[in-house]
Amino acid sequence: VAVKATTTEEETEIPAK
């Protein structure tokens, strides 16, 4: 995963909070 926010590594298209 490129950016790990508060979600799991299954959601890769997430904004960096």
Curated annotation (Swiss-Prot):
<keyword id="KW-0717">Septation</keyword>
<dbReference type="GO" id="GO:0042742">
    <property type="term" value="P:defense response to bacterium"/>
</dbReference>
<dbReference type="GO" id="GO:0016798">
    <property type="term" value="F:hydrolase activity, acting on glycosyl bonds"/>
</dbReference>
<dbReference type="GO" id="GO:0031640">
    <property type="term" value="P:killing of cells of another organism"/>
</dbReference>
<keyword id="KW-0929">Antimicrobial</keyword>
<keyword id="KW-0326">Glycosidase</keyword>
<dbReference type="GO" id="GO:0071555">
    <property type="term" value="P:cell wall organization"/>
</dbReference>
<keyword id="KW-0961">Cell wall biogenesis/degradation</keyword>
<keyword id="KW-0081">Bacteriolytic enzyme</keyword>
<comment type="subunit">
    <text>Monomer.</text>
</comment>
<keyword id="KW-0378">Hydrolase</keyword>
<keyword id="KW-0132">Cell division</keyword>
<keyword id="KW-0131">Cell cycle</keyword>
<protein>
    <recommendedName>
        <fullName>38 kDa autolysin</fullName>
        <ecNumber>3.2.1.-</ecNumber>
    </recommendedName>
</protein>
<comment type="function">
    <text>Hydrolyzes the cell walls of mycobacteria. May play an important role in cell wall growth and cell separation.</text>
</comment>
<dbReference type="GO" id="GO:0000917">
    <property type="term" value="P:division septum assembly"/>
</dbReference>
